[in-house]
Amino acid sequence: MGLETEKADVQLFMDDDSYSRHSGVDYADPEKFADAGGDRDPNQLNSHLKVGFEDVIAEPESTHSLDKVWICSHALFEVSKYVIYKFLTLFLAIPLAFAAGILFATLSCLHIWIVMPFVKTCLMVLPSVQTIWKSVTDVVIAPLCASVGRSFSSVSMQLSRD
């Protein structure tokens, strides 16, 4: 009682006269990408988004709707999912890809030029800081703690019940 879904393939054809190759960017051969429409998620990053009608709507054995209602709702689910996704990607994909590119470029730049030099500087300076800190501890803090300990060691307390 399922519907067969069709896969829509979209191809764009342009004349060489209307396509300018003088922009300075070396574009790849368009015929190479026309056949490469297979797997757009080779690393399975979004495998959890493969949601079908049966994953969302399920009727147990005891409660079944009419067959026509089930078929129409399944068809409407698939069509609306397809159309809404295409509509949203039409308007949001390019701006969001641009924003993600800016974000990742900024984070990469900050990591390469600020974070890693700071970490390397800290790691380079740490042995000197460790030596200085050990000297300060031995000269100031250890005698102070020893004298406070001696002072409190002479204190005695007696409890009496009166």
From Swiss-Prot:
Intramembrane stretch boundaries:
87-107
Phosphotyrosine PTM positions: Y19, Y27
Q: Which residues cross the membrane?
A: none
Family matches, as Pfam families: Caveolin
Q: What's the main place this protein lives?
A: nucleus
Per UniProt, subcellular location reads as: Nucleus; Cytoplasm; Golgi apparatus membrane; Cell membrane
Provide the record's note on post-translational modification: Phosphorylated on serine and tyrosine residues. CAV1 promotes phosphorylation on Ser-23 which then targets the complex to the plasma membrane, lipid rafts and caveolae. Phosphorylation on both Tyr-19 and Tyr-27 is required for insulin-induced 'Ser-727' phosphorylation of STAT3 and its activation. Phosphorylation on Tyr-19 is required for insulin-induced phosphorylation of MAPK1 and DNA binding of STAT3. Tyrosine phosphorylation is induced by both EGF and insulin.
Keyword check for Cytoplasm: yes
**Disulfide bond residue pairs:** none
* Name by which UniProt lists this protein: Caveolin-2
Q: Which gene encodes it?
A: CAV2
